[in-house]
Amino acid sequence: MILGIDTSNYTTSVALVDDDGKILKDCRQVLPVKKGHRGLRQSEALFEHIRNLPELMHTVIGDQPIKNALKAIGVSVAPRPIRDSYMPVFRAGTGIAEILSDAIRVPYYRLSHQEGHIRAAMCETEIFSWQHQLDANWQRQSEPMLAVHFSGGTSEILYVKREKKGFQCKIVGRSLDLHAGQLVDRIGVMLGMDFPAGQALERLANPLQTAPLKLATQVVDGDFHFSGMENAAKQSLQKGEEPANLAYALFEAVGRTLGRAIIALLEKTEVSAVLFSGGVMANEIVKEEARKRIFAFCRSHRRPVSLCFAKPQYATDNAIGCALLAKEAFEAEQKKACND
């Protein structure tokens, strides 16, 4: 068995997978945010993780004979797989992993939250293809792809290649101001919803098939802006726009922005697959608008491509990706040791 731990800005997550990669346990606890507030300070989030971890760890491994069965631990130690990437919240999970690793003498692998998102998104995907067929083992292939990570703390498009441990990630598109999840939560809180507001805002928008309101988007060479949408949304509300119209227009604009950014990057790269992860990518309106726009480009340019959308349970923050990456890194080390 392999244990995964992730302590992100807003969710404490612990997962356990078996030697075949089957998910045995997946436990998560969303951190509480006071009504009317738009987030947590790092110190507040760190405290909540420290409070949540003992109970989640007991739920995941309390009845498991881990002393002889646990082979490795994977833990997110930073937001991104780049030098100097750091947030205090990840110290909570890292500390638990280090203690457990020393106590039962198993290796632990230092991973990033972003890599965990990418790997978890590969677990189960909804794949839409235009004249392109993904190999059955595409999750393990080394061919580069684009990976979208849209959440409350990140809005990036990455050029990704598999490595022996985790992924090599290069940012090729990103928000130059607000993150997509920040935008959604700010508008939701403005409408009186609890933080995080994504699901409640989507429920408000879902009954609409079209909306009379359209928010402008700004995309340049794969980079984009969301702050203008926030200002436009505030102005619309002040003018008496219906909240349901605004909710739909907001998600439609995020999807349109993402679609335009992906198209700009497809024009500059040779990739044939795009993976979508992060909590915002669980939104059906965002997914549909991005897919529709990208496929229109593919048809007109005869560009084969597959769009792989993570199922909602794998799109949001979790520790499954860390567990699976640790499993694969452990297996690679074992194979190398046998060959040597």
Residue ranges with predicted function:
Residues 203-274, 280-297, 327-336:
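A contiguous, well-structured pocket-lining segment that forms one wall/lid of small-molecule binding clefts
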Residues 106, 110-145, 325:
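Conserved phosphate-binding catalytic cores of ATP/NTP-utilizing and phosphoryl-transfer enzymes
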Residues 67-78, 270-281, 308:
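Short glycine-rich phosphate-binding loop at a beta-alpha junction
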Residues 61-98, 102:
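Short beta-strand-loop/turn "lid" adjacent to the catalytic site in phosphate-handling enzymes
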Residues 7-8, 24-26, 139-143, 149-151, ...:
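A short helix-loop
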Residues 117-120, 308-340:
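Glycine-rich phosphate-binding/hydrolytic loop that grips phosphoryl groups
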Residues 8-47, 166-171:
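Short glycine-rich, Thr/Ser-proximal phosphate-binding strand/loop in the N-terminal lobe
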Residues 274, 290-322:
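Conserved phosphate-binding/catalytic loops in two-lobed NTP-binding clefts
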